[in-house]
Regions:
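Core catalytic lobe of class I
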Residues: 1-238
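Long, charged amphipathic helices and adjacent flexible linkers at domain junctions
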Residues: 240-242
């Protein structure tokens, strides 16, 4: 469950939800929606909104990546062999998720191995394991890296400005890229999305672009009209009910 809030409503939202829902709180994504404010005089410029994330059980999660910046690459990919520079990836289990228990090459990790023994043996034969003093690690080469995993601070998706009249058709309209990232991350390809506050229909449009089913609704007739027009323009087949 993703709930978008501006900077001053987080406490109200968490205060209003029931104890059961509050216990499912997972993380707070900080979305930098704009650049610096030049008109501030007596306080901090509010350029960040929050996206509160709640989860139940162990839901689907697909890691998203962004291009490596120079500083990150320099600090992370500092090991080198004859194949090139590489970073160290996890090869063992964790306390919260015990791995495969076995001894290999003199190592017997407390929480097991991340992979089954035959997979670990294959990595060893391919010289893809960095044997550290205390733990082994999987080599991740710079030229094969997917990029830097996106964390809970998003500064690469900007809000739709008021001047972009051809793009902004609803007061609370969110950028399409924002919804597409959320859906790719938390909804499997055969999954379904529910948006109880349709607004401009951006969530439904993002689902259409990504091949997911979506059910959305709104009490505002203006919202339904705007969303319907946007979806039809995109070539989406829709079913509407009042």
């Amino acid at each position: 469950l993703y709930a978008h809030n501006n900077f001053d409503s987080n406490a109200l939202v968490l205060g209003d939800v029931t104890k059961d829902i509050r216990s499912k709180f997972y993380t707070n994504i900080s979305w930098k929606r704009s650049g610096p404010k030049n008109n501030i005089r007596k306080g901090w410029g509010n350029i960040v909104d929050s996206i509160l994330v709640f989860k139940k059980g162990d839901p689907y999660f697909n890691v998203e990546y962004q291009p490596l910046d120079e500083t990150y690459a320099k600090n992370s990919f500092k090991n080198k062999d004859d194949k090139g520079f590489y970073a160290l990836g996890k090869l063992t289990g964790e306390k919260s998720r015990i791995g495969h228990m076995y001894e290999y090459n003199g190592y017997n990790p407390q929480y097991g191995w991340r992979f089954a023994e035959d997979k670990t043996k294959t990595l060893h034969e391919q010289n893809l394991i960095h044997w550290g003093a205390n733990l082994p690690y999987k080599k991740i080469y710079l030229d094969e890296s997917k990029g830097s995993p996106i964390q809970n601070f998003w500064d690469d998706i900007h809000f739709i400005s008021r001047s972009e009249k051809n793009k902004r058709k609803y007061p609370t309209q969110k950028p399409l890229k924002l919804l597409e990232r959320i859906i790719r991350t938390s909804c499997p390809p055969d999954g379904k999305v529910l948006d109880p506050f349709c607004g401009s229909g951006t969530t439904a449009l993002a689902c259409y672009n990504l091949g997911r089913d979506c059910t959305t609704m709104d009490i505002s007739k203006d919202s339904i009209k705007i969303a319907t027009e946007a979806l039809i323009d995109a070539g989406c087949d829709i079913n509407t009910e009042e």
